[in-house]
Amino acid sequence: MLKKFLKGSQAPDPQSKPKESEEILEEQIDAGIKEFKRSNRNLFVSAFTAGLEIGFSVLLMGTLYSLFVGKVSPESMSLLLAISYPIGFIFVIIGRSELFTEHTALALLPVLNGSVTLRNLLILWTIVYVGNIIGGLLFTLLLVQIGPSVGFIQVDSFYHLAKKMVDYDWNTILFSALLAGWMMGLLGWLVT
């Protein structure tokens, strides 16, 4: 359904019957199996691209922080940054890149179904995770070097954004990550 939406097709027919949960699960398993059939190289390039695309969230948040710090209330700043956060995820969805949080659920289904081995799952997860990290790091290095030099991002915006992300104890960060992964899996289920 999301693919149809992105292609600009019309809304689903209201007369059509909703899919049964078994049909959705089968589609999710098939989608997961297709990921395992991709070459490691293509999977890595897609994951690397997703890491770069997610960086646009930080770029936009850092730019907005630099432009509006001290000019708007802290509450307005928090809202502005929260609204701008999803842009990188939108790029990932439109670009059909491979983000690790998507694979935590989607790739697990064929393993639970017995279609794919646990070893293959770990290989896929490693490729996607490493690709995401390398893409994200490269984007970050470029952003940190170029942003302040050109003047569209102040250095203190990086400190502000990082502090907001890691200013919690480890278990809060862990459970937040688990919740985010679960929500991405749920999103995959809902758009099917």
What role is predicted for each listed range?
Residues 2-192:
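Alpha-helical transmembrane segments and their helix-helix packing motifs
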